[in-house]
Amino acid sequence: MSIAPAAHTPMMQQYLGIKAQHPDMLLFYRMGDFYELFFEDAEKAARLLNITLTTRGASAGSPIKMAGVPYHSAEQYLARLLKLGESVVIAEQVGDPAASKGPVERRVSRVVTPGTLTDAGLLDETRDALIMAIAVAGDVLGVAWLNLAAGRFQVTELDRTALPALLARVRPAEILAHEHLDLAADCPVRRLDAWQFDADGASKRLARQFGSCDLQGFGVAEMHCAIAAAGALLGYIETTQRTALPHLLSIRAERDSDFVLLDAATRRNLELTETLRGDAAPTLRSVLDTTCSGMGTRLLRHWLHHPLRDRAAVAARRDAIGVLAAAPDSAARLADLLKRCADVERIGGRIALKNARPRDLSGLRDTLALLPELAAALPTDGARLAALRDAVAATPDVHALLVRAIQPEPASVLREGGVIADGYDAELDELRALTRDAGAFLLELETRERARSGIATLKVEYNKVHGFYIEVGRAQAERVPDDYRRRQTLKNVERYLTPELKAFEDKALSAQERALAREKALFEALLDTLIPHVPNLLSIASALAEIDVLASQAERASTLRLCAPEFSDDPCIVIRGGRHPVVEAQVEHFIPNDVVLNRTRQMLLITGPNMGGKSTYMRQVALITLMACCGLWVPAASARIGAIDQIFTRIGASDDLAGGRSTFMVEMTETANILHSATADSLVLLDEIGRGTSTFDGLALAWAVARHLVSATRAFTLFATHYFELTQLAQEYRQLANVHLDAKEHGADLVFLHAVEDGPASQSYGIQVARLAGVPGPVIHAARRRLRELEDAQLQPGPQGDLFAAHLPRDEAPPHPALDQLRELDPDTLTPKAALDMLYALKALTDSEP
């Protein structure tokens, strides 16, 4: 608004004052039973939510644009706005309308942003809502991210080139970025001024939050840029939440050496939790996820995106799955109990932020009651399961408190009452008794008034609009006693109030209001009592989530015929009978394949027809390796995995239109990243490098890339190609082996065998695949003819499409033998007689052909 606030009405001045503090957020301004939005906010909300935009009254001489949503259904509108990346400020009425001479006082009660969600109705139970802050110090970036609902605070430092991989792994819902950082992200980005990233102030703020004198004990004291980011993030959370954050008790430094690194392209190509089209299935997570709780689902997602390099931690998970797989009854019992558990992690966060709801506490109470059974259902073997059994130890004090304090089936919201259990508070019990006794009093009053008035049809009733009243028919109205005062006249009845009924009404309604106020105070006090227990509750939640994942993977191990991977100190990837878990779930029969990679067999050069299974084979090797590094069982007859530091994939590509990059540029960028970043302990998957340019350029690039990987990088590499010339590299490098996937022609059909065999492929079957794809017959015929001509002329194929050419069966007759003699003929060396003899010879050849 460009008009000075003083020119507006008092209520609009109040609105604009609040709006000025949050100019880039939508303001939900409470007015009675609605949240109203005004001016530009109203226009934006009407467009995004498809609600009515109207005008009401005027301020500063102009109509006020307005849109609103009902108070009781505001949550669904908030969810839609947050999904669209908007942030919302909620201003509630805090003053008494009856006592206010001007506008009712309003204050901001909360600020809701995509990365600070804790409300159950706004959160996706299958994924964490994370908020990230990024600070800049030269070429170094300091990054902090927080799961507010769970109280997990992490930091790292990295160079700018590593940021895309971190964003792909963490997947923040909201980013707070230094004003000078050039950043492209898939989530809302809020720019913060440079002064908000002051490292000294950040260090003090963080130490104060954690109750320590400094940050030495957290392992982050020397990470100055990361501390600056964490301080800016904490300041933002304090501003938006407007409450203490007692569950934020520590911060953890994350380092690249903790994880097997995957860049953004690899996560996308392997379809870990999202397909290339953005769908949730079919993906690795959709195949593996049979967890019973939101906590378990989120943890499994985290594991898949954070494969570990710590062999002890990975082996502990693998062995725990093995114990549960060997005890299917225990795993099934655990699953049954976990289905009945509430989301303790998020409930704990809401308790800490003092925005828990009644059913959060009843859900927590019922979950705590299940802990002894859960602990008893865990098998006694294995160190990891023993630690989890200790972690879910019962909390009798908290459980007993909640049993005493909360109704067995409380109301969904506090304002409805019926939340605090009877017997918990004497004052509340007394107030409730007054309300409960109203029914008996009204029946007794109705009997007395019928006798006193002589009106047998007289009724004593109540409604929320008019309160208590005595109702008689219009025909009986003349018979009512003199102390009856008319309260309401309807078509067929009259409603009255007596002094006695009025006195009771005042007492009863006052008791109801006082009971609601008392219940609210008791509930808030109960949250205060529970807050010191939040760290323990979050530990229990972490254990429940891990038990859920381990039990689900024990079930998957049996159902999907998975095996426990072995870990080797020698550098290798040896998989026998490996299968692609996602593809196998989609097809009736899947052909298993082996892979052997070690220091004497570093690269497999894979040839074969399109649709033959090269990409599936490469991806399954990567997925099996990744699953093993997550501590999961794998789809194979056996698997032995050495130390792996990174997994790279360059499989398929498309134009980056927004970034102005062609398909070939995307391919080369991803390839360059691999060549710069891969080490001898990396797993690299490359599919058809060089196909996006001319044949000679592409072949030269593919040859150079393969040669560099096998001779310089020495990474474990699966290299699929249609450049058959590359198969000759096996003669130069003994660490490179040729393998192929074959197909067989059966009449007019082409049967793909999907089996990996040693040696190079003999054909690509490109024209047959084109025919299977429905390319018109004349085009196929022309392609065969051109292919024959190219082969006969021994020409090097030029266009990209010719890379699929190979020795194909021909439909046409073979070349005439006279043509061979003509090709060998040199007219300049022939005498006239020799020329005549040659002519007769050629004539004889043509006469001999049918």
Swiss-Prot record:
It holds the Pfam family MutS_III. GO terms for molecular function: ATP binding; ATP-dependent DNA damage sensor activity; damaged DNA binding; mismatched DNA binding. One of its GO terms (biological process) is mismatch repair. Keywords: ATP-binding, DNA damage, DNA repair, DNA-binding, Nucleotide-binding. InterPro entries: DNA_mismatch_repair_MutS, DNA_mismatch_repair_MutS-lik_N, DNA_mismatch_repair_MutS/MSH, DNA_mismatch_repair_MutS_C, DNA_mismatch_repair_MutS_clamp, DNA_mismatch_repair_MutS_core, DNA_mismatch_repair_MutS_N, DNA_mismatch_repair_MutS_sf. Signal peptide: none annotated. It comes from the Bacteria. ATP binds at G608, P609, N610, M611, G612, G613, K614, S615. GO terms for cellular component: cytosol. SMART domains: MUTSac, MUTSd. NCBIfam families: mutS1 (TIGR01070), PRK05399.1 (NF003810). This protein is involved in the repair of mismatches in DNA. It is possible that it carries out the mismatch recognition step. This protein has a weak ATPase activity. Belongs to the DNA mismatch repair MutS family. This is DNA mismatch repair protein MutS. It comes from Thiobacillus denitrificans (strain ATCC 25259 / T1). The gene is mutS.
